[in-house]
């Protein structure tokens, strides 16, 4: 008999499996808006539920149906529970249907077609048919709940459903899946109608050559809503072209019966045959033959509108129900030709097949597609070993058509056939006698001999067939005059309402868009063509003599043509405001010296603070280990809590057990929503540090370069609540809750040296990219601490340095993971805290915001110059340090520039910026904005200064600013005015106020959407546009990005999630030159609208 713990573990394992499957089904329902009945998640869910229901089932409850215990159980439950009784009836009907189908498959095929709704179920679906049907019928949760309430009748005592806790949990878990909609309608189409972005762009490329040439950017000034009665004729070619291309792709409603490329068609007599793709499609209603020129299939049509329209005119679409005869001509030296003759006797252009039996294969597919209602006359013959062959008949074709011949000659002899398409079981509408019986009076007006009759429908109905009198003629003129008058009134009415709508829209433009652009229009051609941009020769002249080109002219060149890549390093500091246009070389050198001095000073300040933080954390960790080691109730794993990459904090009044509990509640500081670390990681963390020793004192002193006082110890904690969350124990003190970022303790710092290498780590046993080891020996840990302490002594050993004994605290410590940011850091009021959307932590800031009286009495780390680093500042800096290190490590690692040394530069610049703006702190995405600057400038101090200038504008886009909502509102106004059709689609889908797919674009200035070379071009254009055309140029780039793909969005009726998915797949694959040109055109259009020219 299994032990009690083993049974409990089995129940938990079964329950965990069900939880996982429920989670997957709910995720599928949310992301795809429906759940496929044949989804693999349904199968695995049914298997998991069945395992739980059968666990501990009594043999008596299972009955004698050993092969299907679920069926026996549900049938027994059905005797006293109506939902289960109804389920049993449905499933038994399904089983009979499936069994009957299996039997009929052995017999006649037509009998199978008479079966009502034959279910197409996989073997696994049939295996779990009872659970599956109960789920789709929304009674599974009710039946399981009934089993839980009456478990003693059906289950042994160790069964999952007998457990007073696990049984109700299982029943509750099933409520969610039973509330969902399960359908085959959407899903059957889903695999065809939800193609990737590549597929959508490819389809659009094929048929876009026939779209209207007045694209959204070339429309009239204002886009009045289309009235189909007037503008529909212009739209028909584009719609038919799109539908034509869509029809070429097989979907759930249309089957591709035959496809062959390089089939020749001669559209006109005066031109050569054109190769193309011939395809035969079948739907439930009709069979269609299509032929598309290769130029359209390959997207290789010329740029001229004439060429595009001509090739679309050549495309052929034929409904087979309109075809009566097929004339087949075979030649010995070619593959064969098919001529289709329609019911009215018109012959279609011949299709010439290449060699290789393709004509016979086409006829075979056509004959199979006509079945069961239609057939070829004469039918193709079947020959053993060869399949379908041409019939060998002797002059049996109908009179009036070409004769089909047969002979005893070889098969490759030239032979002609005429096949007729007939439908034996139906009354043909193409019978010649029916046509002959039609009276001349009942013919369409187009076929009437008298042209006058066709102009007036009333006369043609009342007049005689012999011809009309003069009365009829006079009678016809009255409706004609009335028709002309109506047309005149309609034209005037449309013109008036169009003018009225124009005036209203123009008022909206002036109200909402006038502030988005500069009202002075700068020409790209005056005083010279700006298409070449700012070249090296022009820049060299300007540097030698700043009076040769005015600032506005340089900005105009950059706006219309960009900056030559070789001179970007020299030009960008001017664009970003590091230098002012017109500065002399001496003035620029003075600015550089000031920036280098300021950067060195900032570096020394935060490096000094970082050194104190890291050493203090080592002290706290060692003290915590000593206390935890003395506890007799602790298991052996807690003796190895120190991980060399761990993040720790010294929390007062905490026991070792609460430390272990909080250890498992640490939140990752990335922007993901993962809150809990895995148990394996916790055990590994505990196993790697049991041998760390505590050092009672550390040598401490003032940092290099004479550290000045940073901001006060109480900077605003605005926007850090989610990054500084705490746990629920009310006795935590922020005075001692510092985080350990033990990756790179600042090593051997040289006084007066502010170079990048000041921030490098000298820990002999650690590396940022090294994977954690299973264990650290005691000796290795001690050596690591000694090396770190020696590095700190060297850094602090400056004349006048002062040793400061850091306070030691008793109590538990919490061991965490590198990069955590979920610790208390401030003593400010909760009123100043706000949420960050990047979800640094999901734990609320609670009692640890208050500083205890005992903590206030303890000394803070100080330098010899009197600078005091308050515990609050240490906490706040450490929180941001971990965020920075996490983002730096994953910043564009695939790009060639970001080696380990350059990543260190990136970290130094970001830490320096955050030190100067500690009240704002680091937010995910800032590294993305700094990275391109560092790539171009390749100088820490210069990149730091330019990044500071850039963030003056970009800071407002982050959560602590309010610019993002303004961007969304402006995007709404722009799309409403410039592309009303797209706006209507978004309004229809309820997304017109939520342009969240633009969020990443505005946050990072399109950095994630483009490759690096394109990012450089877009950024410098944005910076120049502020002075040339618009300070909100990012809006027009975003609008251009939408407009480039607007036809794809409209054609596929994309909603909010579809648009996000599409642009995520298209990231780094956009044509930046096209987008920038379109953005400039859009700016110019708005400027023209405002001027009302």
Swiss-Prot record:
Domain RUN: 36-190
Keyword Cytoplasm in record: yes
GO aspect biological process, one term: positive regulation of transcription by RNA polymerase II
Rab-GAP TBC domain: residues covered: 562-1026
Subcellular location: Golgi apparatus, trans-Golgi network; Cytoplasm; Cytoplasmic vesicle membrane
Keyword tags: Cytoplasm, Cytoplasmic vesicle, Golgi apparatus, GTPase activation, Membrane
Gene3D superfamilies according to UniProt: 1.20.58.900, 2.30.29.230, putative rabgap domain of human tbc1 domain family member 14 like domains, Ypt/Rab-GAP domain of gyp1p, domain 3
GO cellular component, one term: Golgi apparatus
Effect of residue 256 to A: Abolishes interaction with RAB9A
GO MF terms, alphabetically ordered: GTPase activator activity; small GTPase binding
Required for interaction with RAP family members: region residues: 301-350
SMART domains per UniProt: RUN (SM00593), TBC (SM00164)
Compositionally biased tracts (Polar residues): 647-676, 702-736
Tissue specificity remark: Expressed only in brain.
Location of the region described as Disordered in the Swiss-Prot/TrEMBL record: 377-412, 645-778, 810-838
Highest taxon listed in the record's lineage: Eukaryota
Key word Magnesium present: no
Biased composition (Basic and acidic residues): 687-696, 766-776, 820-829
Membrane topology classification: Peripheral membrane protein
Compositionally biased region (Basic residues): 385-397
Quaternary structure, from the entry: Interacts with RAB9A (GTP-bound form) and RAB9B. Interacts with RAB3A, RAB4A, RAB5A, RAB8A, RAB11A, RAP1A, RAP1B, RAP2A and RAP2B. No interaction with RAB27A.
Function description: Interacts with numerous Rab family members, functioning as Rab effector for some, and as GTPase activator for others. Promotes GTP hydrolysis by RAB34 and RAB36. Probably functions as a GTPase effector with RAB9A and RAB9B; does not stimulate GTP hydrolysis with RAB9A and RAB9B.
Family the entry assigns: Belongs to the RUTBC family.
The protein's name in its UniProt record: Small G protein signaling modulator 1
């Amino acid at each position: 008999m299994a032990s009690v713990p083993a049974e409990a573990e089995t129940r938990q394992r079964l329950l965990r499996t069900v939880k996982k499957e429920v989670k997957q089904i709910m995720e599928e329902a949310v992301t795809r808006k429906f759940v496929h009945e044949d989804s693999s998640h349904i199968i695995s869910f049914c298997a998991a539920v069945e395992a739980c229901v059968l666990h501990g089932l009594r043999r008596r409850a299972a009955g004698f149906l050993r092969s299907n215990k679920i069926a026996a159980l549900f049938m027994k439950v059905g005797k006293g529970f109506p939902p289960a009784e109804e389920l049993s009836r449905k499933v038994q009907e399904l089983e009979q249907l499936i069994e009957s189908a299996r039997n009929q498959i052995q017999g006649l095929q037509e009998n199978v077609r008479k079966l009502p709704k034959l279910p197409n179920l996989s073997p696994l679906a049939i295996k779990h048919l009872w659970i599956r049907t109960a789920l789709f019928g929304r009674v599974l949760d009710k039946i399981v709940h009934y089993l839980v309430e009456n478990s003693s009748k059906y289950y042994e005592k160790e069964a999952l459903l007998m457990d007073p806790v696990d049984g109700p949990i299982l029943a509750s878990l099933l409520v969610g899946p039973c509330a969902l909609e399960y359908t085959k309608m959407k899903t059957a189409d889903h695999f065809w109608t939800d193609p990737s972005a590549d597929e959508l762009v490819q389809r659009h490329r094929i048929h876009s050559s026939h779209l209207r040439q007045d694209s959204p950017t070339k429309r009239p000034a204002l886009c009045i809503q289309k009235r189909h009665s007037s503008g529909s004729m212009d739209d028909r070619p584009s719609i038919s072209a799109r539908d034509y291309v869509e029809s070429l792709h097989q979907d759930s409603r249309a089957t591709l019966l035959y496809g062959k490329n390089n089939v020749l068609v001669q559209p006109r007599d005066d031109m050569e045959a054109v190769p193309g793709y011939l395809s035969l499609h079948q739907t439930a209603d009709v069979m269609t033959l299509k032929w598309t020129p290769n130029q359209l299939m390959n997207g290789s049509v010329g740029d001229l509108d004439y060429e595009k329209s001509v090739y679309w005119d050549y495309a052929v679409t034929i409904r087979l129900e309109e075809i009566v005869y097929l004339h087949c001509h075979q030649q010995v030296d070619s593959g064969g030709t098919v001529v289709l003759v329609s019911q009215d006797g018109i012959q279609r252009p011949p299709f010439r097949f290449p060699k290789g039996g393709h004509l016979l294969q086409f006829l075979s597919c056509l004959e199979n597609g006509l079945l069961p209602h239609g057939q070829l006359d004469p039918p193709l013959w079947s020959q053993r070993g060869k399949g379908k062959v041409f019939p060998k008949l002797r002059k049996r074709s109908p009179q009036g058509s070409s004769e089909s011949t047969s002979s005893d000659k070889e098969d490759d002899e030239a032979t002609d056939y005429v096949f007729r398409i007939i439908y034996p079981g139906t009354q043909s509408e193409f019978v010649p006698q029916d046509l002959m019986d039609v009276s001349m009076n009942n013919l369409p007006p187009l076929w009437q001999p008298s042209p006058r009759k066709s102009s007036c429908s009333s006369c043609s109905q009342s007049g005689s067939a012999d011809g009309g009198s003069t009365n009829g003629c006079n009678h016809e003129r009255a409706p004609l005059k009335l028709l002309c008058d109506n047309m005149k009134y309609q034209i005037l009415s449309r013109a008036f309402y169009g003018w009225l709508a124009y005036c209203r829209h123009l008022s909206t433009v002036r109200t909402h868009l006038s502030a988005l652009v500069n009202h002075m229009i700068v020409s790209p051609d005056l005083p010279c063509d700006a298409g070449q941009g700012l070249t090296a020769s022009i820049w060299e002249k300007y540097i030698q003599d700043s009076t040769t080109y005015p600032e506005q002219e340089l900005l105009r060149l950059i706006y219309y043509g960009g900056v030559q890549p070789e001179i970007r390093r020299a030009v960008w500091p001017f664009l970003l405001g590091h230098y002012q246009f017109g500065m002399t070389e001496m003035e620029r050198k003075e600015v550089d010296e000031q920036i280098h001095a300021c950067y060195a000073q900032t570096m020394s300040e935060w490096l000094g603070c970082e050194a104190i933080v890291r050493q203090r954390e080592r002290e706290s960790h060692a003290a915590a280990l000593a206390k935890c080691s003395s506890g007799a109730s602790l298991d052996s794993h807690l003796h190895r809590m120190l991980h060399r990459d761990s993040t720790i904090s010294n929390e007062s009044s905490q026991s070792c057990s609460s430390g272990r509990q909080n250890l498992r509640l640490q939140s990752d500081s990335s922007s993901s929503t993962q809150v809990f670390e895995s148990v394996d990681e916790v055990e590994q963390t505990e196993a790697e540090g049991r041998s760390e020793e505590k050092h009672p004192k550390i040598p401490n002193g003032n940092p290099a370069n004479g550290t000045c006082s940073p901001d006060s110890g109480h900077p605003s904690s605005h926007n850090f609540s989610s990054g500084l969350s705490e746990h629920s124990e009310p006795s935590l003190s922020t005075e001692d809750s510092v985080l350990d970022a033990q990756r790179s303790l600042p090593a051997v710092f040289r006084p007066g040296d502010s170079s990048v290498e000041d921030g490098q780590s000298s820990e002999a046993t650690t590396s940022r990219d090294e994977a954690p080891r299973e264990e650290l020996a005691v000796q290795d840990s001690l050596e690591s601490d000694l090396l770190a302490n020696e590095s700190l002594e060297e850094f602090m050993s400056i004349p006048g340095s002062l040793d400061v004994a850091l306070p030691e605290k008793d109590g538990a410590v919490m061991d965490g993971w590198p990069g955590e940011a979920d610790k208390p850091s401030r003593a400010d009021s909760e009123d100043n805290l706000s949420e960050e959307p990047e979800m640094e932590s999901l734990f609320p800031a609670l009692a640890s915001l208050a500083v205890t009286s005992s903590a206030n009495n303890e000394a803070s780390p100080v330098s010899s110059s009197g600078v005091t680093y308050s515990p609050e500042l240490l906490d706040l800096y450490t929180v941001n340090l971990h965020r920075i290190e996490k983002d730096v490590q994953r910043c564009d690692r695939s790009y060639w520039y970001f080696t380990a040394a350059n990543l260190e530069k990136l970290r130094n610049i970001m830490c320096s910026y955050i030190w100067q703006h500690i009240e704002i702190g680091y937010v995910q995405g800032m590294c993305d904005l700094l990275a391109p600057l560092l790539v171009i400038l390749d100088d820490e101090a210069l990149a730091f200064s330019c990044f500071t200038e850039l963030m003056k504008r970009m800071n407002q886009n982050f959560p602590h600013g309010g610019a993002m909502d303004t961007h969304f509102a402006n995007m709404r106004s722009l799309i409403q005015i410039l592309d009303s059709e797209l706006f209507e689609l978004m309004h229809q889908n309820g997304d017109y106020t939520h342009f969240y797919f633009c969020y990443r674009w505005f946050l990072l200035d399109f950095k994630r959407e483009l490759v690096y070379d394109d990012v450089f071009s877009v950024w410098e254009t944005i910076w120049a546009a502020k002075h040339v055309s618009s300070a909100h140029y990012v809006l027009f780039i975003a609008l251009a990005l939408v407009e480039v793909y607007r036809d794809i969005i409209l054609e596929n009726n994309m909603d909010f999630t579809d648009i996000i998915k599409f642009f995520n797949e298209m990231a780094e694959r956009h044509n930046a030159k096209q987008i920038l040109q379109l953005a400039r055109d859009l700016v110019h259009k708005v400027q023209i609208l405002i001027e009302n020219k």
